[in-house]
């Protein structure tokens, strides 16, 4: 699946919103009449009246080519330039009145597209539309005010987003707009945390996706993550930060530190180094471009969390032994939407990079935009390196995938969610055989 990624658009808007304190934008009226009405509503157990600023599908819907947002009008123009009508194969010149997104060459082609109407694809496209307009609405975003350290007497529930938010004391997510905004950002750190956590929602085969080899890898990592439960853990190991390698990093490398801190809060006894690796991992907002660095760029969030950016391919650092020695108790790898099977990125992943990954013998987890996207990736790895790898986790729906719908500007009817499916594998370990 080929997705056009533009960090200067919606992603940059997210980072702008995340860096602003939501409480600085909340304006509270203290008029006596409002206090009195609030008291009456509370006494009667009534819900407060909706605010005109509250997002709804009605007040967030605008056709993109008539949008009050300049960048959405530009995006509509980009779709018309890049995409083709699924019915006629011609340029797209017609905006679907149900979704507000340019989708077909003409109204006649739109009416003829039986698959589009039968599948109600326009309903998902409408969600794409209203979510994007909500981000640009100027409303307060109190949902971006994330909680701090969890008390040791409080357990985190990782069954789903709702229970995670509740047990971590997040701002109450009452609308789909709030969920979409927050889950897109938190999907990366919480996907990692949900796999490594002792209360992970993923269980062992046959009831769950985790294989026996996967259980071994996760048990090794959890042995390190919970040192107080493993008194025999060597002091030298406890003093070393756990390394999380994210290969092919792009959007996840741009997340602010306080977003990634939500991962560290799940493991208060452990410090982390997050290594963002790849030619597009370092983005300079002032220059509006990706930059290269011949040396690692280090950013320390606090004493428990550090980012390291390396703007080359993983095999370069692997061959130079920059990360040696690897430790399956202390190191884990993630690739978010790598596109192993995609024609555009197949060559950069399935050669030296994949060989180097498998040589580490550490756990590798990967996500996909949808089930087919991830299944194609895993099947390709199996077909080329099947004898050199163990499957750790069968492809499964990611409990902590983003709930925000996105669309591909090159094919506006191709919709997806970030990190929708997840799977895992590792280079095969060979057990020592004692010879007689």
Swiss-Prot record:
Spans annotated as Disordered: 43-66
Consequence recorded when altering residue 199 to I: Partially suppresses the respiratory defect of SHY1 mutants by increasing COX1 translation
Subcellular localization: Mitochondrion inner membrane
Topological type in the membrane: Peripheral membrane protein
Keywords linked to the UniProt accession: Membrane, Mitochondrion, Mitochondrion inner membrane, mRNA processing, mRNA splicing, Transit peptide
Transit peptide: 1-26
GO molecular function terms noted in the UniProt entry: translation regulator activity
Outcome of swapping residue 167 to R: Partially suppresses the respiratory defect of SHY1 mutants by increasing COX1 translation
GO BP term (any one): mitochondrial cytochrome c oxidase assembly
A Gene Ontology term for the protein's cellular component: mitochondrion
Family designation: Belongs to the MSS51 family.
Subunit structure: Interacts with COX1 and COX14.
Protein name: Protein MSS51, mitochondrial
């Amino acid at each position: 699946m080929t997705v056009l990624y533009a960090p200067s658009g919606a992603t940059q808007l997210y980072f702008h919103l995340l860096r602003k304190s939501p409480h600085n934008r909340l304006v509270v009226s203290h008029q006596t009449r409002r206090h009195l009405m609030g008291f009456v509503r509370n006494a009667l157990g009534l819900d407060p009246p909706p605010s005109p600023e509250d997002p709804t599908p009605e007040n967030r819907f605008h056709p993109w080519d008539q949008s009050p947002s300049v960048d959405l009008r530009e995006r509509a123009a980009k779709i018309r330039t890049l995409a083709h009508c699924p019915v006629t194969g011609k340029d797209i010149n017609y905006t679907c009145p149900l979704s507000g997104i340019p989708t077909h060459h003409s109204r006649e082609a739109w009416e003829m597209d039986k698959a589009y109407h039968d599948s109600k694809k326009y309903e998902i496209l409408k969600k794409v539309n209203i979510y994007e307009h909500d981000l640009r609405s100027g409303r307060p975003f109190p949902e971006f005010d994330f909680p701090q350290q969890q008390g040791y007497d409080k357990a985190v529930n990782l069954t789903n987003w709702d229970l995670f938010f509740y047990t971590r004391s997040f701002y109450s997510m009452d609308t789909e707009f709030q969920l979409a905004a927050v889950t897109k950002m938190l999907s990366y750190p919480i996907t990692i945390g949900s796999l490594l956590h002792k209360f992970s929602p993923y269980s062992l085969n046959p009831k769950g996706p985790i294989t026996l080899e996967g259980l071994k890898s996760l048990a090794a990592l959890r042995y390190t993550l919970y040192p107080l439960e493993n008194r025999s853990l060597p002091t030298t190991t406890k003093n070393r930060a756990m390394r999380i390698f994210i290969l092919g990093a792009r959007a996840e490398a741009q997340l602010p530190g306080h977003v990634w801190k939500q991962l560290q809060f799940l493991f208060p006894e452990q410090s982390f180094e997050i290594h963002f690796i790849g030619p597009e991992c370092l983005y300079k907002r002032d220059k509006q471009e990706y930059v290269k660095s011949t040396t690692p760029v280090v950013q320390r969030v606090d004493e428990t969390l550090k980012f390291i950016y390396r703007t080359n391919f993983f095999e370069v650092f692997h061959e130079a032994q920059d990360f040696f020695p690897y430790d399956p108790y202390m190191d884990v790898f993630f690739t978010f939407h790598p596109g192993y099977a995609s024609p555009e990125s197949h060559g950069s992943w399935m050669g030296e990079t994949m060989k180097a990954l498998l040589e580490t013998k550490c756990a590798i987890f990967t996500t996909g935009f949808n089930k087919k996207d991830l299944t194609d990736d895993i099947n390709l790895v199996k077909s080329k390196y099947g004898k050199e790898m163990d499957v750790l986790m069968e492809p499964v729906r990611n409990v902590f995938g983003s709930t925000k719908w996105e669309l591909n500007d090159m094919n506006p009817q191709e919709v997806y969610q970030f990190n929708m499916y997840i799977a895992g594998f590792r280079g095969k370990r060979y057990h020592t055989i004692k010879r007689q």
